[in-house]
């Protein structure tokens, strides 16, 4: 199974964590073909029409649901993290096979054995 480690390449801590993640995959003999994946950053995010409240609750005019702000120091970093995952979900669909999405600080403590899958998984 392919695995992608979301990594902020220009951040040495992120890169160090990602290398540790890769090493833990090797050390546990996990059944993963892992690689570092370039994270979206606040500087590289694509435009979004952000309608979720940054402060104070509000009612969604389309659903009548109450929207509560997500506590975050930097909303653009939160959007960038979501976009990294979104891009990988699209990659999963494009290659038409399961993938594993990992944050840079993930560590394997035992062997991961990729499950056998069929077309009806998740249906």
Label for each model-derived stretch:
Residues 1-102, 106-123:
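An acidic/histidine-cluster motif and surrounding catalytic segment
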């Amino acid at each position: 199974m392919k695995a992608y480690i979301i990594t902020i390449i220009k951040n040495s801590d992120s890169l160090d964590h990602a290398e540790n993640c890769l090493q833990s995959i090797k050390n546990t003999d996990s059944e993963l073909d892992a690689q570092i994946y370039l994270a979206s950053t606040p500087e590289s995010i694509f435009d979004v029409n952000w309608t979720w409240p940054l402060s104070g609750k509000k009612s969604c005019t389309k659903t009548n649901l109450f929207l509560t702000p997500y506590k975050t120091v930097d909303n653009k970093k939160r959007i960038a993290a979501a976009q990294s995952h979104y891009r990988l979900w699209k990659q999963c669909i494009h290659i038409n096979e399961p993938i594993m999405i990992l944050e840079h600080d993930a560590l394997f403590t035992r062997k991961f054995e990729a499950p056998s899958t069929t077309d009806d998984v998740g249906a």
